[in-house]
Amino acid sequence: MSDYQVLLYYKYTTIDDPETFAKEHLAACKEMELKGRILVATEGINGTVSGTVEATNKYMDYMANDARFADMVFKIDAADAHAFKKMHVRPRAEIVSLSLEEDVNPLEVTGTYLEPSEFREALLDEDTVILDARNDYEFDIGHFRGAVRPDIQNFRELPGWIEDNREQLADKKIVTYCTGGIRCEKFSGWLKTAGFDDVSQLHGGIATYGKNEETKGELWDGQMYVFDERIAVPINQVNPTIVGKDYFDGTPCERYINCANPYCNKQILASIENEKKYLRSCSHDCRVHPANLYTKNLSKEEFTERLQAIDETLPEMVQ
């Protein structure tokens, strides 16, 4: 049995003073020796925390004693250690940011909830568009079979992508999904206000679908990206597959790294061998960038040799 747990949760509810709440909540979390990342806004709370089984159970009891969060659903993953290095609770304008001119309140408008078994039926329906509401790098390591991959690197870019592709989506039955459900609550609501009539969402997100005894994560390919030290977790208990591809050679890969140029920091899938071969950099410009955190530890001679091995050279100004 694992000694630790990771809790994923959210709740759209009114928090009158997010700054005071965040300060007090941080103190409570630290007292319970939790680590994680929690966002608080007037519209609610969005968090992921890790801790011992005892500590996380205590936290869930603590939240249940607050009427605002009494019915909040926690997605629970077993873990061998903390999934975060520190504990942060931050006040924000939104708990998920779509940066709309007129914000959408999921308590007033949101897509129809589909339970896991209903969502699986939608996956098999040729007349339904399954729309991934996550970022492109999340999709690339794992997604539902046949889902549409929006070309976005941030959630707030999604409405713009929808508008650019409105013709293909018009009059379609749309079902959207995300990690734990929070993004879809707001996004599906926005879709309805934007003129899309038949909009549904996976209730509880991918995390719930993967743990459902009936679906067991079936029709999910790859792993689910998570925003903590684990990076990705398995979902499909029936016939798991690898869909991630190495950025450099296209071979199957589920290992994410960040480009060593801090001004880029792009997330790419790469094997240990290719990380070394390509100096943990996504492009030539990033490899030779003066701020590169990987190459700064190499001598000029070694740097030159490593570049020559991949048919590249140092810029003249550096030579």
Swiss-Prot record:
Broadest EC class?
Answer: oxidoreductase
Q: Fetch the SMART domains from UniProt.
A: RHOD
One GO MF annotation is: oxidoreductase activity, acting on paired donors, with incorporation or reduction of molecular oxygen
| A Pfam family assignment | Rhodanese
Q: Where is the active site?
A: C178 (cysteine persulfide intermediate)
What are the recorded Gene Ontology BP terms?
tRNA modification
Could you tell me which InterPro entries the record lists for this protein?
Answer: Rhodanese-like_dom, Rhodanese-like_dom_sf, Rhodanese_C, TrhO, TRHO_N
Keyword annotations from UniProtKB, A to Z: Oxidoreductase, tRNA processing
Q: Which reaction does it catalyse?
A: uridine(34) in tRNA + AH2 + O2 = 5-hydroxyuridine(34) in tRNA + A + H2O
Provide the E.C. number(s) assigned to this enzyme. 1.14.-.-
Question: Which PROSITE patterns has this protein been placed in?
Answer: RHODANESE_3
Q: Which residues form the Rhodanese domain?
A: 124-218
Which NCBIfam families did the record assign?
Answer: PRK00142.1-3
**Could you say which protein family the record assigns here?**
Belongs to the TrhO family.
Biological function = Catalyzes oxygen-dependent 5-hydroxyuridine (ho5U) modification at position 34 in tRNAs.
Q: What name does this protein carry?
A: tRNA uridine(34) hydroxylase
- The organism encoding this protein is Listeria monocytogenes serotype 4b (strain CLIP80459)
